[in-house]
């Protein structure tokens, strides 16, 4: 059997991290088994559907390199949905109710299905409603449309959140009512906050776009969501290809995973420090509208120097503002900087710059903290930074002297 999975978001809001994890699991399962991963936009709610939300979904998948094999819009299949509703009526599996059509449920029978993650799940028939499948205005409901589309698209494995379990019982009856083969189901436990409650906007950002805007790298987001409920031994870092090779849906945990922003940012820091320097520089540059006022080689060197202390691209960008901004409102010790300027003007510092500054500190009466802090403020407009000596060496003597003179004007 050729595996076919699908991710079926609705363009009625921005894609949230739970939805993105579902997309990742569907993508990996299909690729792991040499199958197809389809994207279905469930846009039948015309009043709430929005092209901006649709674009955010498409961009999020592109951002994480989750390539899909086919894009389907549910709204184009409305006539097919109605056709199936009428067929269920003809088969005695549905009935009219005040102009609408409802699924006929045998409330005396137990409905059960086997889940690839949670095992066998069952529900008493009297707990399953005779759900509306066709509204009185002739429009199909989600409950019907999703089954028809999954069948017609040849979906073999439905991987989705555990909040859909109650839907599955009624949907199973639609499959059986039409005489269709049932796909395999895998319901992923929901994502909770660190306190064990359902994740919500009160816990901070939950939309994918918010994390992208905050400077999370796609590699970090992919890797973090991948391991949010799934693991492979003690391995913590996965490339997409490694994840494809190792992913097993039956290894997904049965309990809700807890979303920890600190762990996500820690993982992001790992990628900021470890990905190719040119890539990180490009990520920073994409956030800056202003012209870089240092040389490109200096900019690259500053990215390398500062990236080790940053947990997001936005934080790194903020630390590098001196590369495109000349304004600084920090007060400096003019006497100290005048002395340092005079010293540096008359010294061939080269590789001995560290020693030159140490000797000055020992003779000047100023502390090392005072000297280095004032140099930082004059050179980059910050009180704290990596090695000020390295910063000076990257700028070069001419630029350092110019900046010191400007700070004394």
From Swiss-Prot:
This is Glutamate--tRNA ligase 2. A motif ('HIGH' region) lies at residues 9-19. A motif ('KMSKS' region) lies at residues 198-202. ATP binds at residue 201. It catalyses: tRNA(Glu) + L-glutamate + ATP = L-glutamyl-tRNA(Glu) + AMP + diphosphate. It comes from the Bacteria. The keyword Ligase applies. Keywords: Aminoacyl-tRNA synthetase, ATP-binding, Cytoplasm, Ligase, Nucleotide-binding, Protein biosynthesis. It comes from Neorickettsia sennetsu (strain ATCC VR-367 / Miyayama) (Ehrlichia sennetsu).
């Amino acid at each position: 059997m050729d595996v076919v999975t699908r991710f079926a978001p609705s363009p009625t809001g921005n894609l949230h991290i739970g939805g993105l994890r579902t997309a990742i699991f569907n993508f990996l399962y299909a690729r792991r088994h040499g199958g197809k991963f389809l994207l279905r936009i469930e846009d039948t709610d015309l009043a709430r559907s929005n092209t901006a939300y649709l674009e955010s979904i498409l961009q999020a998948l592109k951002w994480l390199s989750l390539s899909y094999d086919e894009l389907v819009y549910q709204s184009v299949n409305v006539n097919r949905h109605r056709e199936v509703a009428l067929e269920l009526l003809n088969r005695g599996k549905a009935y009219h109710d005040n102009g609408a059509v409802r699924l006929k449920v045998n409330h005396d029978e137990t409905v059960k299905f086997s889940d690839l993650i949670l095992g066998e799940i069952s529900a008493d028939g009297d707990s399953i409603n005779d759900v509306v499948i066709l509204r009185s205005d002739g429009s199909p409901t989600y409950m019907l449309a999703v089954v028809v589309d999954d069948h017609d698209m040849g979906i073999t494995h439905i991987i989705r959140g555990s909040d859909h379990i109650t839907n599955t019982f009624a949907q199973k009856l639609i499959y059986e009512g039409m005489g269709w083969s049932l796909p395999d189901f895998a319901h992923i436990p929901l994502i909770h906050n660190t306190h064990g409650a359902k994740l919500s906007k009160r816990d901070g950002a939950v939309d994918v776009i918010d994390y992208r805007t905050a400077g999370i790298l796609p590699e970090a987001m992919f890797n973090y969501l991948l391991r949010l409920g799934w693991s492979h031994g003690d391995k913590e870092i996965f490339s997409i290809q490694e994840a494809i090779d190792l992913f097993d849906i039956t290894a997904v945990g049965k309990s809700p995973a807890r979303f920890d922003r600190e762990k996500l940012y820690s993982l992001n820091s790992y990628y900021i420090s470890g990905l190719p320097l040119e890539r990180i520089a490009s990520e920073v540059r994409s956030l800056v509208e202003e012209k870089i006022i240092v040389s490109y080689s200096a900019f690259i060197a500053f990215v390398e120097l500062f990236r080790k202390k940053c947990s997001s691209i936005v934080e790194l960008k903020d630390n590098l503002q001196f590369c495109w901004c000349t304004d600084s409102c920090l007060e400096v010790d003019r006497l100290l900087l005048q002395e340092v300027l005079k010293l540096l003007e008359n010294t061939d510092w080269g590789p001995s710059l560290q020693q030159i500054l140490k000797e000055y500190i020992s003779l000047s009466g100023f502390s090392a903290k005072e000297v280095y802090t004032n140099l930082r403020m004059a050179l980059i407009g910050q009180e704290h930074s990596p090695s000020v000596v390295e910063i000076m060496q990257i700028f070069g003597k001419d630029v350092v002297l110019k900046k010191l003179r400007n700070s004394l004007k």
